[in-house]
Curated annotation (Swiss-Prot):
Compartments in which it is found: Plastid, Chloroplast thylakoid membrane
GO molecular function, one term: quinone binding
Top-level taxonomy: Eukaryota, Viridiplantae, Streptophyta, Embryophyta, Tracheophyta
One cellular-component annotation, GO: chloroplast thylakoid membrane
Pfam families documented for this protein: Oxidored_q3 (PF00499)
Protein source organism: Acorus calamus var. americanus
Record has Transport as a keyword: yes
Protein's job: NDH shuttles electrons from NAD(P)H:plastoquinone, via FMN and iron-sulfur (Fe-S) centers, to quinones in the photosynthetic chain and possibly in a chloroplast respiratory chain. The immediate electron acceptor for the enzyme in this species is believed to be plastoquinone. Couples the redox reaction to proton translocation, and thus conserves the redox energy in a proton gradient.
Keywords assigned by UniProt, alphabetized: Chloroplast, Membrane, NAD, NADP, Plastid, Plastoquinone, Quinone, Thylakoid, Translocase, Transmembrane, Transmembrane helix, Transport
Subunit structure: NDH is composed of at least 16 different subunits, 5 of which are encoded in the nucleus.
Gene3D superfamilies associated with the record: NADH-ubiquinone/plastoquinone oxidoreductase chain 6, subunit NuoJ
Record-given protein name: NAD(P)H-quinone oxidoreductase subunit 6, chloroplastic
Domain of life of the source: Eukaryota
Length: 177
């Protein structure tokens, strides 16, 4: 979207706070239903980030695939579980929880250091295609394929990795209960 600077900044802050609050809700809420709805909030905020960066197709794919399919699948899996086991139980951390927390924290800090050490000055941020494409010779499907393999390659791959992780998490939750 081509918005004026202050409005764009306000929307970025609003969506960023929605992402942070939704992510904290996914991790900290003890009721799995509330965690699943917080995950839905996170996925919708990510889709709105794509809309702000003029990636309308990726935003639509994000909404259809993740919010419409994966999040609904997770909510159904959680609803089929026995919800009374999770409402007020307090449990102590096990060794596996500590190891998982340590691994996730180390990955987070390595990502933060990588992002901070990267020289972002040489990267050209453009929304135009890297190839010259004749409008008359290509169909809409071919244009989508060209854009997915050039301009939106990295977001498309990240979306596929997130989808894989979400499916593995849903399968793991369903097997445990």
């Amino acid at each position: 979207m081509d918005l004026p600077g202050p409005i764009h900044d306000v929307l970025l802050v609003f969506l960023g706070s929605g992402l942070i609050l939704g992510g904290l809700g996914v991790v900290l809420l003890t009721n799995p239903i509330y965690s699943a709805f917080s995950l839905g909030l996170v996925l919708v905020c990510i889709s709105l980030f794509y809309i702000l960066s003029n990636s309308y197709f990726v935003a639509a794919a994000q909404l259809l695939i993740y919010v419409g399919a994966v999040n609904v699948l997770i909510i159904f899996a959680v609803m089929f579980m026995n919800g009374s086991d999770y409402s007020n139980d307090f449990y102590l951390w096990t060794v596996g929880d500590g190891v998982t927390s340590l691994v996730c924290t180390s990955i987070l800090f390595s990502l933060i250091t990588t992002i901070l050490d990267t020289s972002w000055y040489g990267i050209i941020w453009n929304t135009g295609s890297n190839q010259i494409v004749e409008q008359d010779l290509t169909s809409n499907v071919q244009q989508i394929g060209i854009h997915l393999s050039t301009d939106f390659y990295l977001p498309f791959e990240l979306v596929s990795i997130i989808l894989l992780v979400a499916l593995i998490g849903a399968i793991t939750m369903a097997r445990q209960y």
